[in-house]
Structure formats: structure tokens, C-alpha cells
């Protein structure tokens, strides 16, 4: 074998690497060091760019003379080779993409050989070659000499290459394998990509250089003074350092020379995510200048409550992968900056680095911009849970109701889950990954919690890891959700873990845990799974978080959809690249699209997490400040407007002082009750621009119904009246006068034709409609819906009676919604009244067998002319809205078209509904109802959205498809979360609704 077998030996993790240490870049001058730009350092040589490249299907194909052969290709560094025509993309969530035989990996293990030259005139210095991220392992050669080996994809591997360099041209060769034994610990839910995906650079250091330093401090009880300590480690022997501290305004606090630092700092300015005040510590050695930003903060737990600077805080967090449709894992400053800016724009204050450390500069940005970080180690072995059990894992492991669920099956899976957590062979690797994470980022202010990893079970290896972290860093807390999954033979020590953490627990789980005094805070490290049209439960979760001081919030799964570009230029998900096994579109579960376009999910979450909330109490507007450290007057201005029957009548703006976690009354005079619908709209706007946000940026909004008993005053119509004639045959009943013509299908009991002045208003017969294109959150209920025949349902009539009066023709229809091979889905008792002015009243009494699954929706489907694709409505808009997902929208008058109303989720599904509507008006149709209704206008049928797998495969209907719904079931987050709550399901055993339809080309008020 040409390559040493290090890649299948868990006892050989690194060969000739520098020990893990804090990340920093030495400079020659203060000016460049203070710039924060490492490229300006004279001691830093970036080796990114086009490298020579050879690709082999297996490392066995690597020729003996691989260091001498010519290179056939070029590849950018950093990059993933799957994005450049080598190998193929592979998405899997849980299952390993290779046989489970730890520590062995397949012989058909793809291999990439990278090469570049470096011109150098070596000095009497040390030269450190850094790789910030390589998947999965690397062998390093300089001038054809083996330098070393390392594995751990998402952390830095550093080699001292001083003794291998020569004057002039130097040849750097790196062999990267797709898999190694470390891949068993890197089974994260993502596209599996390979190669050198983070920066490569060479550092020039002194012979006796500062190798590591650790900044620590203790704050006094008043959080005003700090005892600041800096421990240092030099490569050879201790050396004196000149320490200089600058305050956030740039003024010198102290200047002191010593080997280690121990000094009191008075009148400190604290760091938090709302006000990220950073000090600057400058370390001057004999030849180098090193700059490290410091934020003074204190994180602790008291009485089961998470405190930050002695204030309880809530994580308004997200889980973030490094992911881009074009660059894969290779993320630049600009890409990360865009993510962080979008997060700030949408009220996100915390990030879990799922499920590995990000690039070392990422947390610097979070220090600067103000985010709380859970710094997670590069450990996940979820696939071990599937070792001997192939079942619907999420529903069992997460304790969701399932017909196949048994405690034995669940415990078998958990025992498998803990494989690597208990295996002594992998103890060294698990501990190494914790040490790499902690040592590299230990001086980062924004990292306030260390996480041992993700979905790897619990056992002795993680006990040792948690104990090591607690001994090494007493200033931060330790998190590990998988501690709740323990092997049946174990009784584990959890004393070094500071949180009770769950994934996708329900609001009832939060209430249950917090109902009794607990020593540990409750955190949902993953919740409200953002797959497709999702996050309908965000408001309910935050109501639960706010109910309980012991609940410290959570981290939505996840920030962005994962989808590389396909050859056709469109996004692809699991299975689109010919891979097996795969998990389909389960990677499309982000708040933003792969190219960072916000989904409605993110807009919902933003407003749920708005910094202030208002409510009407005793005819006064009370505002609550949900900020943790900032007075509202220092942060935002409130724009307000009064809306009467959909029309803005007056408004203004104001600033009000309200301390964190407190409430005040807004000095706004309310209108008198005149029986109309009065709404008060509040818009919270940022006072002053920040590094990421512009002044006047909307931080969220509020809408209050000032007189809840009042209803919208609908338009009044003047339409010519004329007596109808009625004609009946075996199949139909025709009703017509000089203007209107209606045809009732006697077999279905519904209108098959509606015309005005000889022009068809509906292009196909109306439908009673119960189906919707399943959302990703319907993936567990979808089978039950289809088994009940909901997707093939149609209407049949049993009895029709009619009578005519001077005012109207009235039909009484007894019918049902049925399906092939199934019994009745709904029993319908319908009364149609066609009035002499052409208006139709449709009164429906429906009875539903309660043994059937809840309904996706119920309503009428209209097939309008393609050209009739513009509507006005009063309801929740402009964004799509649902019974549980309408906090992103306000009630008001809006206009939309069929195309504008449609959202292209990568996997097509229900979208574009609008909740809480009082009326809808198109060119030839006006709809109102006995209660607020939902509607959807789309260029696509629900059948088309159900059938197609990708948005770019959709074929538009020949019609504009309008659905008017009594109710649409909610959205929830059941793709990987709790079942949809009963109050958001259409599950009544009996319900009534009346729709009023007016068909007129020019509707006049």
C-alpha cells in the first residue's frame, strides 16, 4: 500500500501536526494587526487558487510514483471536488454512505491528489502550513517528502514544514481521501462532499513563537470590574509580552509587560448580542503583533435559569450549516456576512454551528456583530442507530405516535445509537474533536456554550469529553442533546452537562419539564423544522418559551436549504444525482433557499421574535419589551396607523422608554367605536443604523383589533334584477334570465356552468374540494389521507329538490364526498339560493366520520379564465398565511395575481393560501362568507403540485385555479416534529358555512 493505513486506524488521528491551539494570525505592525485582515500580515501567505489535480476512483488506483506523474486537471482551492465534475453529489441524512464496519472504509474510496508550487526564500524561521478544512483526511508532502497526516474535516490541521522547504520553487502535494475512520464520526445530515474546502495558508513564525494563549477573566458581583488573566505558551521557552488593552472606543486601558497577564480592569463595558462591545487586546512579542478582541460577559445558571450578564435570555436561534449551491462547503467572508446580515434582519440572535466548527474567522464575525454561539464539535454518528433496525426512525426515536412503535424497538435503536459513545476504540477520536474545537475557539466571546456534538448517543467517551471541557474552560456551559439517549446497560454521569436539551419536543414537553423545579434549563437545540412550507408552530413555541423562565428558547432547524445546482442549472436534492441511499428532499429544510432568498417561514419567525409586543388592555395599548439589555427608546421607533374598514385614516410615530423585560402604556388615543372594523397597525423600526442594519429597518409589526365585536363593512351592490326561468331534464337543471345562466349537475349536485351575458364565468364545473398538495409537513399524514381516498375524492348527489319564489330559486341538495374503494368522507346537506339579481348563496352543512383522518381543507374550487388572474381581497397578506402561520401578515386590502401568489418550493406543495379573508373580488366574481375564509389563486392545480417532484417540472393549468375554503388545516412542522395540534386541524364532526357569490363584470360599491 502506497499510503500508510492511518485512515483506518482510530489510534492515529494526526501525524506530525502542531498541537491544537487558539486561532490567531501574527502581524509585523500594529496597523495591519488592528485591521483584522489576515491577508495584510507579512507573515501570512494565502495558498488558495487554482491547484493541479488528479482524481482516482480508489486510493488503490494511486500509482507508486504519484508524486512524479503529470496532472490532468485544475481545481480551485478551496472547493469540493463534487462541484467540479469529479465523483457525484450524495445526500443522506442518517444512513452511512458506506458499509458499517468501523474503523474500515471501502476499498473503492475515491482519492484526490492536489499539487501547487510555492516560491520561497526560507529565513531562520518556522513555517507552519495550515489547512482550515479538508474532508475527510489528508496526507501532506513537501518536495516529495512525507510531512504528515491529519483527520477532522471541520477543524484546522497545522504542520510545521520548516525542515522540508528549500530556496526557490517548493512543491506542495496533498492527498485527500473521501472517507476515513473519522467519517464514522462525521455522519451529519448534509450533502456529503470531499476535498480541500477551506483556506490553506503558510505562516512565518519566529523560532521561539507564541504558540497559544488563553484569555480568562472573572467579573465582580456588580459586573463592573474584571480580573483579566492571559496564559501563554511559547514553542520553546517563556518570553515576556507587552500587553495593551483598548476599550471599545479605542482608548488605552492599560499597557503592561510580563510573561503572563493578571490585571484588574475597571468600569468595563459588557458584551451582549444586542450591544456587542468589544475591547482589543494587543500582544507584542519580540517580532510579532497579535490582536485579539475581547468581550466581557458572564454566563451562568441559577435556579435552573440561564443568565447572561445576570439577565435571563432566550435564544432566538437557528442551526447553520456551511452550504452553498455552487461552492458547497467552501464559504467566503462575503457569504457568511450575507447569512449574518439576513439573520440580524430577521431577529435571530443565536447560532448553533451545526454540526461542526465553522471556519475560525466565523466566530470573529459573530463577536463583532452580536450573536450567541453554541460551538459544536465535529461529531455525529447518527447512522449507527440504523445498524440492525430499519424502521421509520424519526417517529420512533422521537417518541412520536406510530403503529410500529414499541419500547423494545426504540431501545434497540438507542443501544445502536450509542455505539461510538461507548466504544473504547473511538474514545481518543471523540476527545480529540472536543479539544480541537475548544482550543481553537477558546478566546471567542460569542461562543458561550460548548456542544459535544450531535446525534451520537451517550456513553463513557462523552462523559470523558464533558469532564475535560469543564476542567479546561470553566467560563462556559456544556451542552449535548444526545445525553437523553443512553444504552440500556449504562447508568451515565450527566453532572458535567448544563442543559436539558431536546430536539423537536412539543410545547407540552416544555410545559411538562418546566412545571417542576429543575436544576438545568430547557433548550430545544432543534425545533420547528423549516422544511418547505413550514414553521406554523413558531408562535406556539414562543408562547411556551415565554411562559417559563427555565426555558431558554431554541434553535430552528435549519438556516438554509441544501441543494447543489444540477447540470440543468436547477437545484437538486437527494436522488437527483443517482446516489443511493438517499433521503430525498429532506435536505430542503431551511428558512432561506439555497441561494439565500427568504422563505415565508423566515418572515413568520421574524415577527414571532419581534423585539416588542403590544396588546389591548382596558382600552389602552400596553407594550412589552422583549429585549434583554436595551430600553425600547434606545432601539426603536414605533410607527402607527389607524385603519377603518381597510382604509388608513390617521397615524404617527413615537418613541417610548420601556426597560428590558418590562411594560408601559403607549400614549395613543384610540378612536370611538362607530361599529366599523378598526385596526391599529404598529411597525417597530430601528432607530440608528448598525453594521448590519440600516436605520428605519422594520424589526417587526403588530396589529390590534380595537373593537373585536365589530366586523368589516362589506361593499354594497346595485345589480339589475330579473326573474329566472327553470328547466329540468334527467341530468341537469338550467336556471336563466336575460343576464345570467346557471346549470346544476344533478349527478354531482354542484354547478357545472355559470354564464353572464353568454360568457362563461367558470370554465369547468365547480368542485367541492378537500385535497391539497401535501406539504413536507404532511409527509407523515399523507399516507393516511391517501388511504382514506382524499386525493381521489369526488361529489355525488342523492336527492335534489327545488322551488321558486319571487326573490329566488332555491335548491336543496343531499350529497356526499366519496372516493374509490372507500366509504363516505363527508355527508353534505346543501342549500343553493339563486337570487333575482344573480347572486348565489351556498349554505353547506357537513358531517364528517370522526374515525377518518382530519381533512386537508374543505371548500369550493373555481376554474376561471386564464386571463382572470388578478384578485383583490381583505385578509392576511401579502405573504401566504394559514390558521397557525399568519403572524408574518396583517389583515388588510391586498391585490395579487395567480403567478405572484405562487411560491416555488423546490419540491412543489401547497402554498399561497390566505387566511382570515372577509371578501375576495376578481373581474367577474365577488365572494364573501358567513365567517372569515381562506382562499388560494394559482396557475397550477393541486394535482399538478402533488404529482411533480421539482418546481421546474410544473405545467401551468389552462385556467386560473381559485380555491375558496371554509378552512385549511394548519402547516405545523411535522416533517420532523410534533403532530399538528388539534386546534389547527379540520377535524370537526360537523360544520356549517355559507358562501355568498356575486357574478358581475363591474362590481359597484
Curated annotation (Swiss-Prot):
GO molecular function: beta-galactosidase activity; carbohydrate binding
Reactions catalysed according to its record: Hydrolysis of terminal non-reducing beta-D-galactose residues in beta-D-galactosides
Database matches in Pfam families: Bgal_small_N (PF02929), Glyco_hydro_2 (PF00703), Glyco_hydro_2_C (PF02836), Glyco_hydro_2_N (PF02837), LacZ_4 (PF16353)
Record keywords: Glycosidase, Hydrolase
Swiss-Prot/TrEMBL GO biological process terms: lactose catabolic process
GO cellular component: beta-galactosidase complex
Positions of the catalytic residues: 455 (proton donor), 526 (nucleophile)
Keyword field contains Hydrolase: yes
Keyword Hydrolase: yes
Class of this enzyme: hydrolase
EC nos: 3.2.1.23
Domain of life: Bacteria
Protein family membership: Belongs to the glycosyl hydrolase 2 family.
Name this polypeptide is given: Beta-galactosidase
Amino acid at each position: 500500500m502506497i499510503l500508510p493505513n492511518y485512515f483506518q486506524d482510530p489510534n492515529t488521528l494526526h501525524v506530525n501536526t502542531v498541537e491544537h491551539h487558539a486561532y490567531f494570525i501574527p502581524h509585523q505592525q500594529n496597523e495591519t494587526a488592528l485591521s483584522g485582515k489576515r491577508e495584510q500580515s507579512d507573515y501570512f501567505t494565502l495558498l488558495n487558487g487554482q491547484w493541479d489535480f488528479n482524481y482516482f476512483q480508489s486510493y488503490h488506483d494511486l500509482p507508486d510514483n504519484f508524486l512524479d506523474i503529470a496532472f490532468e486537471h485544475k481545481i480551485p482551492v478551496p472547493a469540493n471536488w463534487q462541484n467540479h465534475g469529479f465523483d457525484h453529489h450524495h445526500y443522506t441524512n442518517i444512513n452511512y454512505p458506506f458499509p458499517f464496519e468501523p474503523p474500515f472504509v471501502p476499498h473503492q474510496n475515491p482519492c484526490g491528489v492536489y499539487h501547487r508550487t510555492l516560491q520561497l526564500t526560507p529565513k531562520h524561521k518556522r513555517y507552519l502550513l495550515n489547512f482550515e478544512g479538508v474532508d475527510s483526511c489528508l496526507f501532506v508532502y513537501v518536495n516529495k517528502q512525507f510531512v504528515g497526516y491529519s483527520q477532522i474535516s471541520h477543524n484546522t490541521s497545522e504542520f510545521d514544514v520548516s525542515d522540508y522547504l528549500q530556496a526557490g520553487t517548493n512543491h506542495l502535494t496533498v492527498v485527500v481521501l473521501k472517507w476515513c475512520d473519522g467519517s464514522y464520526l462525521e455522519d451529519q445530515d448534509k450533502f456529503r462532499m470531499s476535498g480541500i474546502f477551506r483556506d490553506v495558508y503558510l505562516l512565518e513564525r519566529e523560532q521561539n513563537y507564541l504558540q497559544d494563549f488563553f484569555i480568562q477573566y472573572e467579573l465582580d458581583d456588580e459586573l463592573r470590574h474584571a480580573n483579566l488573566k492571559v496564559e501563554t505558551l511559547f514553542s520553546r521557552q517563556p518570553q515576556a509580552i507587552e500587553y495593551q488593552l483598548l476599550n471599545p472606543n479605542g482608548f488605552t486601558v492599560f499597557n503592561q509587560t510580563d510573561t503572563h497577564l493578571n490585571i484588574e480592569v475597571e468600569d468595563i463595558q459588557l458584551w451582549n448580542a444586542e450591544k456587542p462591545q468589544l475591547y482589543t487586546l494587543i500582544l507584542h512579542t519580540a517580532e510579532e503583533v497579535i490582536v485579539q478582541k475581547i468581550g466581557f460577559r458572564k454566563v451562568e445558571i441559577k435556579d435552573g435559569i440561564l443568565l447572561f450578564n445576570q439577565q435571563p435570555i432566550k435564544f432566538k436561534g437557528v442551526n447553520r450549516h456551511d452550504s452553498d449551491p455552487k461552492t458547497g462547503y467552501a464559504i467566503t467572508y462575503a457569504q457568511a456576512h450575507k447569512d449574518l446580515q439576513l439573520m440580524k434582519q430577521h431577529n435571530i440572535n443565536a447560532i448553533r454551528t451545526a454540526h461542526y466548527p465553522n471556519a475560525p474567522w466565523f466566530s470573529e464575525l459573530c463577536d463583532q456583530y452580536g450573536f450567541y454561539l453554541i460551538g459544536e464539535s465535529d461529531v455525529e454518528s447518527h447512522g449507527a442507530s440504523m445498524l440492525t433496525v430499519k424502521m421509520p426512525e424519526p417517529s420512533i426515536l422521537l417518541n412520536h405516535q406510530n403503529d410500529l412503535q414499541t419500547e423494545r424497538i426504540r431501545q434497540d435503536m438507542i443501544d445502536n445509537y450509542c455505539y461510538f459513545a461507548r466504544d473504547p476504540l473511538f474514545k481518543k477520536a471523540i476527545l480529540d474533536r472536543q479539544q480541537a474545537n475548544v482550543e481553537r475557539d477558546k478566546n471567542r466571546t460569542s461562543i458561550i456554550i460548548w456542544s459535544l456534538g450531535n446525534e451520537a448517543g451517550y456513553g463513557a467517551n462523552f462523559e470523558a469529553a464533558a469532564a475535560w471541557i469543564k476542567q479546561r474552560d470553566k467560563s462556559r456551559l456544556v451542552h449535548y442533546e444526545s445525553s437523553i439517549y443512553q444504552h440500556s446497560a449504562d447508568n451515565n454521569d450527566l453532572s458535567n452537562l448544563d442543559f436539558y436539551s431536546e430536539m423537536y419536543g412539543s410545547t407540552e414537553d416544555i410545559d411538562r419539564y418546566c412545571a417542576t423545579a429543575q436544576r438545568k434549563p430547557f433548550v430545544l437545540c432543534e425545533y420547528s423544522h423549516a422544511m418547505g412550507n413550514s414553521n406554523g408552530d413558531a408562535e406556539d413555541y414562543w408562547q411556551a418559551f415565554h411562559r417559563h423562565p427555565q426555558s431558554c428558547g431554541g434553535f430552528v432547524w435549519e438556516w438554509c436549504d441544501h441543494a447543489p445546482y444540477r447540470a440543468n442549472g436547477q437545484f437538486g436534492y437527494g436522488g437527483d444525482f443517482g446516489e443511493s441511499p438517499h433521503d430525498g428532499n429532506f435536505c430542503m429544510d431551511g428558512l432561506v433557499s439555497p441561494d439565500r432568498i427568504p422563505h415565508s417561514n423566515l418572515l413568520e419567525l421574524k415577527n414571532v421574535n419581534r423585539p416588542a409586543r403590544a396588546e389591548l388592555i382596558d382600552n389602552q395599548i400596553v407594550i412589552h419589551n422583549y429585549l434583554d439589555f436595551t430600553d425600547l427608546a434606545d432601539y426603536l421607533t414605533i410607527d402607527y396607523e389607524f385603519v377603518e374598514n381597510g382604509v388608513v385614516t390617521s397615524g404617527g410615530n413615537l418613541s417610548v422608554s420601556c426597560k428590558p423585560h418590562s411594560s408601559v402604556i403607549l400614549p395613543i388615543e384610540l378612536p370611538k367605536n362607530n361599529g366599523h372594523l378598526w385596526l391599529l397597525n404598529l411597525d417597530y423600526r430601528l432607530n440608528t443604523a448598525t453594521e448590519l442594519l440600516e436605520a428605519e429597518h422594520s424589526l417587526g409589526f403588530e396589529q390590534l383589533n380595537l373593537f373585536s365585536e365589530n366586523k368589516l363593512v362589506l361593499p354594497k351592490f346595485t345589480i339589475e334584477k330579473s326573474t329566472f326561468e327553470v328547466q329540468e331534464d334527467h341530468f341537469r337543471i338550467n336556471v336563466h334570465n336575460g343576464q345570467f345562466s346557471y346549470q346544476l349537475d344533478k349527478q354531482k349536485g354542484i354547478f357545472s356552468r355559470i354564464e353572464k351575458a353568454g360568457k362563461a364565468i367558470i370554465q369547468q364545473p365547480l368542485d367541492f374540494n378537500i385535497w391539497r398538495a401535501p406539504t413536507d409537513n404532511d409527509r407523515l399524514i399523507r399516507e393516511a389521507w391517501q388511504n382514506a381516498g382524499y386525493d381521489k375524492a369526488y361529489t355525488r348527489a342523492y336527492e335534489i329538490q327545488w322551488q321558486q319564489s319571487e326573490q329566488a330559486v332555491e335548491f336543496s341538495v343531499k350529497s356526499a364526498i366519496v372516493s374509490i374503494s372507500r366509504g363516505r368522507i363527508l355527508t353534505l346537506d346543501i342549500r343553493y339560493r339563486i337570487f333575482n339579481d344573480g347572486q348565489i348563496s351556498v349554505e353547506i352543512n357537513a358531517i364528517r366520520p370522526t374515525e377518518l383522518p382530519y381533512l386537508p381543507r374543505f371548500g369550493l374550487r373555481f376554474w376561471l379564465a386564464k386571463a382572470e388572474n388578478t384578485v383583490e381581497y381583505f385578509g392576511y397578506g401579502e405573504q401566504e398565511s394559514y390558521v397557525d402561520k399568519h403572524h408574518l401578515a396583517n389583515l388588510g386590502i391586498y391585490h395579487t395575481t395567480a403567478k405572484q401568489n405562487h411560491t416555488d418550493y423546490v419540491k412543489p406543495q401547497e402554498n399561497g393560501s390566505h387566511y382570515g379573508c372577509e371578501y375576495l373580488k376578481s373581474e367577474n366574481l365577488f365572494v364573501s362568507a358567513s365567517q372569515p375564509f381562506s382562499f388560494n389563486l394559482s396557475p397550477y392545480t393541486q394535482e399538478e403540485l402533488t404529482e411533480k417532484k421539482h418546481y421546474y417540472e410544473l405545467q401551468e393549468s389552462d385556467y386560473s385555479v381559485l380555491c375558496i375554503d371554509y378552512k385549511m388545516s394548519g402547516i405545523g412542522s411535522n416533517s420532523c416534529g410534533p403532530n399538528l395540534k388539534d386546534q389547527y386541524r379540520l377535524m370537526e364532526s360537523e360544520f356549517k358555512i355559507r358562501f355568498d357569490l356575486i357574478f358581475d363584470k363591474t362590481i359597484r360599491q
